[in-house]
Amino acid sequence: MKLNKGEVKKLYEEALSLVKSKPPEFFNLRKMRDTVGLCYWSDIELDYRRDIIPTAFHELFHYMRPDWSESNIKYAESRVINTCTPLEVATFFKYLADKLFECEFKKEQSGHQISHKKRKIKYNQ
């Protein structure tokens, strides 16, 4: 798999658009033991103790392209992170941080963690 700068830009824009369009409950922070992020059809979970920005791109790419292999997802994540300008990364992080804050604030206000059965997205490896 090869991605030129135009394709990388499209992936970035699609990921940013997805962050903007999903409800705050779609993005969750939690401590994880053996992974840094998980992608389900219902939400994306990120370990807040790890590299959130690359992990968020990685999990969003799993959501956007469930047919891609893990190596293709890692490649796309690396290309986006290394091709984006600091302003593009900051813009992505701002929208993601706003969603994460709203979700965590709602959980705190309600006094409990949101829990539900999840169906993991299956993808080729």
Residue ranges and their predicted role:
Residues 1-50, 66-125:
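Metalloprotease/metallohydrolase-associated module, dominated by Zn2+-dependent proteases
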Residues 54-66:
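Active-site recognition of the HExxH zinc-binding catalytic motif
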